Each structure stands twice: as C-alpha cells, then as structure tokens.
C-alpha cells in the first residue's frame, strides 16, 4: 500500500486541476507501473526489434509521445536487465513519462535536416536514459555534452552510453550550476531534468512520499532555480531549453520556470506543448507546460516545460581563463590514414569523418564540434577510444566495435554470427568452440542478430574471447521463444 504523507495530500489537493479527482490520483499511485522500454535506433529499428521479440511472447503498445517507446507485456518474472538483447544495447528500460523531455526538446520544427543542432547539453544525465534517447534522436551527429554531479552515477552513465553505442558524447562531472559561467551561450539546446522531490515516482517506490515536507520542497526549488539559470546562460540566443522533473508540486515546476521569466523577462519565451502528441492537451497547463498527473496516461507523474531564449543576456561572472595541458593532440595525416586503413581493411569499418586524436599510444574519435570546447572545461570522457597502437600494429577497443560496427560495416567485414546460446557464453567470458574447424582468421567481430557483441580471435577451431574483463556477466538471460504467437 502506498504511503502518502498527509501534508503532501493537503498541498496537492489545492493544486490538482478541477477536472481531476483526488480519489483517482490516490488510486493511480497505488497501481504498479506498466513496464516500458525504448528501442535503441542507433542499433536496430523499432520494426526489426518487434519482429525479433514478438516470437518471445512480447506484445507492444505504442507510447504516444515517443516513436520508439513501448509499453510491453511479457513474463514479468524475467529480469530484463540480464536479457541478452538488453546487454547488447538494443533497448533501454525506461519509464514512459521520462521519454517526454527529449521528445519535447527535439520537436520536428526545432530539429530539421536543414537546421540540425550541433551542440546539445544534458545538465543532469545519470543514469543515461534521456542522454541515450537524445543521442539516438541526433543520430550520433554533432556533440552531446552529458553532465552528472554524482561521482558514482558518472560510472553508470558512462556504462550506459557505451552499451547503447552513443559515440558523440562528452561526459563531465560538475555541479550543474557552473555551466552558465564556463560554457556561456555555447549550446543550441539544453535539457535539464532537475533533481527533485520525486513525488511522481511513488508508483515504483511506495515510501517516496512517506517523509514529505514543505521545507524540503522549498530547499530543492532553490537548487532548481540556480540550475535552470545556469542552463539558460549556457544556451545560445535562439536556442531551446527543456526543464523537467518527476515531481508534482508547483514550487518545483511552474514556480521555477516563472522565476526564470521574472529574472530574464522577454528573453524567456515559453513554448506550448499542447500539440506535442495526440492527447497532450489533457496535461497542458495555462502556460503551455505539460503537468502529467499519474492518472492521465497511467504513467509516472512528470512535469515538462519548454522555452526559447529570444536574446543574449549578460553573463554573471567574467569569462574563466582557458585551461592548459589538454592531453590529446590531433593525429598526423600519416597516423590518421593508418588507423583508417586498419579499421577498413582489417575490420571492414569505415570511420566517420570526425576528429582523430592521439594520447600517448591511444587513438580516439572526437566529434568535430568538440574543438570549440577544448580548454574551457575538464571532461571525464570524450567520444570513443578507437584502438591502442604498438610495434605490432593496432589493437581495437571494445567500445569502438560497439559504437561503429553497425551501419558502418562493409560486406567484407570479418564477422562471425553466433547463436543465442553462443552469445550467452561469449558475454559470460567463455571461448566459443567452432563446429567446423578451418583456417585461423585472426581478429573477428562477434555478432548476434546482426548487432555486435565484441571482438574475438579466430583460432581455426574456436573463438578466443576478447571481451574486456569488466564487462563479463555472471548471468545472461535468454528469453525463450513461445510455442505460439500472442
């Protein structure tokens, strides 16, 4: 039974729209959430994913605000985080409401082929659901800066970015309040899914509101005001900003947006989201924001606001000095050609036309747009590591295969397709015996279902596992095929 603090009920009763009832709200909070996932279109189309999973008993109900999001039905005893297809990065387990902010930011009118955003900021990124959703919407083009304040959550963010094959990300680990100072008016678009009271999450955490207090809400809202101001300062004139929370009270939602409008006046223009998807008007506020109460769409509670920065605004602090000792240098023409030839001739992968950078014996691939950010802030991770070099040649890195061995694979690529059982063995760090012995082929890309799992060394009679030790799984779930379609 859900635990709703009486002080919370008293506050929300005053804020609940007239057409919604408190009884319906409480009943919705007490229902389990529907299971939802988002297909990772960096690796597979939604149609192909449905074709892959329907024989395994999955049914798909489209989420109206996310083209690649679905409520799913399946055997709920299965731990989907251990599923082979999840480990491969074919899908992300993501609550339906949390797919709203990237959708609101990347509306067709704001993101067209002729005016693609080059630099996007996700100010509070971990664990990575919205970051990887935006990476897919950007089709791994441009630069996506993903920031996370918590050190432990940066590791989770990095793991998810790699798993999903998001190659154009640069990760930072800062308090989000510094971005307006360090990267003033640098981004075409900014998403801030702000830390909040989490009132909308009660359907998956029955105790989320047990200790609710107005003092806590007031304290959190002050942090949110500082964050949205920093995000606004980091936004270019003409750019778009989406502010979202998974909470329900006005202080953390409309109140934060109204604060920004009070400070910056006409430079802040609220954009209506009433036409974002069919039925959006049911959650649209007078300002044009989306205030998603859990009973409206049978989802988590959520808030989403979108605004345009109509004019430049003065920066609050002097521009910081450029930082020195950036550890990467551009590859020479000879080095760049060497790594391109290795990927093309040995692996069958055409490297994208991006910056090839070198650090010691490491070769990296950076987005071109990152050039403008060198020295302006310290980055935890940039782009993808391609390979290490030695006197014997190059040694490809796992993350490069995961990010690049998809659409860039040529027909001559050295791949070995494995069964689901063999894929499970591979992900658990074991070598794969080959049914028919043949000539050793050296480095090969191991694939399952057309998507890469990683590298192995073809020794003629077996595939010697080259999966990085830190990615070896203790458990891999093979979802069984059903005897009849559902």
From Swiss-Prot:
Active-site feature positions: 246 (nucleophile)
Family the entry assigns: Belongs to the class I-like SAM-binding methyltransferase superfamily. RsmB/NOP family.
Q: Which InterPro entries match?
A: Methyltr_RsmF_N, MeTrfase_RsmB-F_NOP2_cat, MeTrfase_RsmB-F_NOP2_dom, Nol1_Nop2_Fmu_2, Nop2p, RCMT, rRNA_ssu_MeTfrase_F, SAM-dependent_MTases_sf
What gene makes this protein?
Answer: rsmF
The species is: Shewanella baltica (strain OS195)
- A Pfam short name: Methyltr_RsmF_N
Q: What does this protein do?
A: Specifically methylates the cytosine at position 1407 (m5C1407) of 16S rRNA.
Intrachain S-S bonds: none
Task: Name the chemical reaction catalysed here.
Answer: cytidine(1407) in 16S rRNA + S-adenosyl-L-methionine = 5-methylcytidine(1407) in 16S rRNA + S-adenosyl-L-homocysteine + H(+)
The Gene Ontology CC terms held by the record are: cytoplasm
Q: What is this protein called?
A: Ribosomal RNA small subunit methyltransferase F
Note the PROSITE patterns from the entry. Answer: SAM_MT_RSMB_NOP (PS51686)
Give one GO biological process term.
Answer: rRNA base methylation
Alphabetized GO MF terms: RNA binding; rRNA (cytosine-C5-)-methyltransferase activity
Task: Could you list this entry's UniProt keywords, alphabetically sorted.
Answer: Cytoplasm, Methyltransferase, RNA-binding, rRNA processing, S-adenosyl-L-methionine, Transferase
Annotated residues for binding of S-adenosyl-L-methionine: 124-130, 148, 175, 193
Where does it mainly reside?
A: cytoplasm
Keyword Membrane present in the record's keywords: the answer is: no
Q: What is its EC number?
A: 2.1.1.178
List locations, semicolon-separated. Answer: Cytoplasm
């Amino acid at each position: 039974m859900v635990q709703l603090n009486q002080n919370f009920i008293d506050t929300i009763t005053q804020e609940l729209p007239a057409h919604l009832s408190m009884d319906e709200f409480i009943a919705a909070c007490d229902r389990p959430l529907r299971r939802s996932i988002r297909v990772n279109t960096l690796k597979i189309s939604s149609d192909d994913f449905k074709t892959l999973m329907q024989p395994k008993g999955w049914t798909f109900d489209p989420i109206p605000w996310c083209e690649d999001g679905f409520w799913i039905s399946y055997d709920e005893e299965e731990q989907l985080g251990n599923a082979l297809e999840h480990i491969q990065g074919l899908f992300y387990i993501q609550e339906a409401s949390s797919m709203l902010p990237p959708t609101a930011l990347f509306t067709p009118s704001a993101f067209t082929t002729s005016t693609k955003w080059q630099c996007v900021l996700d100010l509070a990124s971990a664990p990575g659901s919205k970051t990887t959703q935006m990476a897919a919407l950007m089709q791994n083009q441009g630069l996506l800066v993903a920031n996370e304040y918590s050190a432990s959550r940066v590791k989770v963010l990095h793991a998810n970015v790699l798993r999903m094959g998001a190659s154009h990300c640069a990760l930072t680990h800062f308090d989000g309040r510094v971005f307006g100072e360090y990267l003033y008016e640098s981004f075409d678009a900014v998403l801030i899914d702000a830390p909040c009271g989490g009132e909308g999450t009660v359907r998956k955490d029955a105790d989320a509101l047990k200790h609710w207090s107005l003092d806590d809400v007031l304290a959190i809202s002050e942090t949110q005001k500082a964050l949205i101001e920093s995000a606004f300062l980091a936004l270019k004139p003409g750019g778009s900003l989406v502010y979202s929370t998974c909470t329900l009270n006005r202080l953390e939602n409309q109140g934060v947006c109204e604060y920004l409008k009070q400070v910056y006046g006409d430079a802040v223009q609220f954009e209506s989201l009433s036409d974002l998807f069919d039925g959006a008007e049911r959650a649209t506020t007078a300002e044009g924001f989306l205030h998603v109460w859990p009973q409206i769409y049978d989802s988590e509670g959520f808030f989403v606001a979108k605004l345009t920065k109509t004019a430049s605004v003065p920066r609050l602090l002097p521009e910081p000095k450029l930082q020195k000792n950036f550890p990467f240098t551009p590859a020479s023409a000879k080095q760049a050609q060497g790594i391109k030839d290795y990927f093309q001739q040995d692996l069958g992968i055409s490297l994208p036309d991006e910056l090839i950078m070198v650090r010691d014996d490491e070769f990296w691939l950076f987005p071109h747009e990152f050039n403008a950010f060198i020295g302006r802030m310290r980055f935890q991770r940039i782009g993808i590591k391609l390979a290490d070099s030695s006197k014997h040649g190059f040694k490809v890195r796992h993350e490069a295969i995961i990010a690049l061995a998809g659409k860039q694979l040529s027909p001559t690529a050295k791949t070995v397709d494995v069964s689901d059982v063999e894929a499970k063995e591979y992900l658990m760090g074991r070598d794969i015996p080959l049914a028919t012995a043949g000539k050793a082929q050296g480095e090969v890309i191991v694939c399952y279902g057309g998507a890469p799992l990683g590298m192995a060394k073809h020794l003629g009679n077996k595939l010697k596992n080259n999966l990085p030790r830190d990615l070896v799984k203790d458990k891999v779930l093979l979802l069984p095929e059903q005897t009849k379609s559902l």
